[in-house]
From Swiss-Prot:
Disulfide bonds: none annotated. This is Superoxide dismutase [Mn] 1. It catalyses: 2 superoxide + 2 H(+) = H2O2 + O2. Destroys superoxide anion radicals which are normally produced within the cells and which are toxic to biological systems.
Length: 144
């Protein structure tokens, strides 16, 4: 899994540093990035999932969505469009560079992220997430 891959890559990097040999470091760094991002995004996705979930946000998050997107419905429409176009993930992130919430597409775990952004919500739209229950109807999964 992602954690094992991440840990193995970290061990390789540590051994390379100690030995002063860096031939395998580039691959290990890619594995840290891929497995680390895969683990973090899946962890956030599972935290977002709840049998009681699905309601509109309240409080500061709701206020910020209204400020940055105009309304919850506008945010939701844009988020669903991002998820429909994504090869891997749609994320609601806080972009600290522009000080606003954004919907972003991340086609692979480690590609498409916006530097300085902090993920708030993640939707896994890889086929393994929906195909068993929804078949090819990815849009139905996104709307659920």
């Amino acid at each position: 899994g992602y954690v094992n891959g991440w840990n193995a890559a970290e061990e390789t990097l540590e051994a390379n540093r100690e030995a002063g040999e860096f031939d395998s470091s580039a691959g290990a760094i890619r594995n840290v990035t891929h497995n680390g991002c895969g683990h973090i995004l899946h962890d956030l996705f599972w935290q977002n999932m709840s049998p009681e979930g699905g309601d509109e946000p309240a409080g500061a998050l709701a206020d910020r969505i209204a400020e940055d997107f105009g309304s919850y419905d506008a945010w939701k429409g844009e988020f669903e469009a991002a998820a429909g176009a994504a090869g891997g993930w749609a994320l609601l992130v806080y972009d600290s560079f522009s000080n606003q919430l954004r919907n972003v597409v991340v086609d692979k775990h480690d590609q498409g992220a916006l530097w300085g952004s902090h993920p708030i919500l993640a939707l896994d739209v890889w086929e393994h997430s929906y195909y068993h229950d929804y078949g090819p109807a990815r849009g139905d999964f996104i709307s659920a």
